[in-house]
Amino acid sequence: MEKLTDLNYTSSVITLMNSTLHTILEDPGMAYFPYIASVLTVLFTLHKASIPTMKIALKTSKCSYKVVKYCIVTIFNTLLKLAGYKEQITTKDEIEKQMDRVVKEMRRQLEMIDKLTTREIEQVELLKRIHDKLMIRAVDEIDMTKEINQKNVRTLEEWENGKNPYEPKEVTAAM
């Protein structure tokens, strides 16, 4: 029985559209006919597609408000696309999802900045320690005996009899 009433309803809508189109065609100055026909076709298609969909959705879903809201937003977005607009209507849920995504990305970037800042602070501290070590030792205080391997070399006061054993001695040879 429902199919029969849907068929009667559809035929009455088609009859209404045809009569509307005939009255538009009778006017000789009507230059916007293709646009009006396109709009009427879209409206009829949306009407025929959305009514059964909404009926099924309302019967099967527990949360009818969200379904109705989603259907209406989808219909308006379709109409906006057909009109040539690039903007779309978004629901609160979509806005909240986008906000959550933005907040998550901001947190990730803040953590990265924190890690980089910590690393930079550690590098600055390391450079400061290196600089302090270089600046504390004066040139006079550096023990070069370790560098040239002369730890066991004696000074002039430490030599026996005060003579340097490494100085060449005068040698006289017989001729």
UniProtKB/Swiss-Prot annotation:
Bilayer-spanning residue ranges: 29-51
Pfam families linked: Rota_NSP4 (PF01452)
UniProt name for this protein: Non-structural glycoprotein 4
Location of this chain's protein in the cell: Host rough endoplasmic reticulum membrane; Host membrane, Host caveola; Secreted
Intervals, Cytoplasmic compartment: 52-175
Membrane-related topology note: Single-pass type III membrane protein
Subunit organization: Homotetramer. Interacts with the immature particle in the viroplasm. Interacts with host CAV1, early and late in infection. Interacts with host integrin ITGA1/ITGB1 heterodimer. Interacts with host integrin ITGA2/ITGB1 heterodimer. Interaction with microtubules blocks trafficking to the Golgi apparatus.
Protein source organism: Rotavirus A (strain RVA/Cow/United States/NCDV-Lincoln/1969/G6P6[1])
Superkingdom field: Viruses
Coiled-coil region list: none
Keywords: Activation of host autophagy by virus, Calcium, Enterotoxin, Glycoprotein, Host endoplasmic reticulum, Host membrane, Host-virus interaction, Ion channel, Ion transport, Membrane, Metal-binding, Secreted, Signal-anchor, Toxin, Transmembrane, Transmembrane helix, Transport, Viral ion channel, Virulence
Record bears the keyword Secreted: yes
PTM section of the record: Mannosylated.
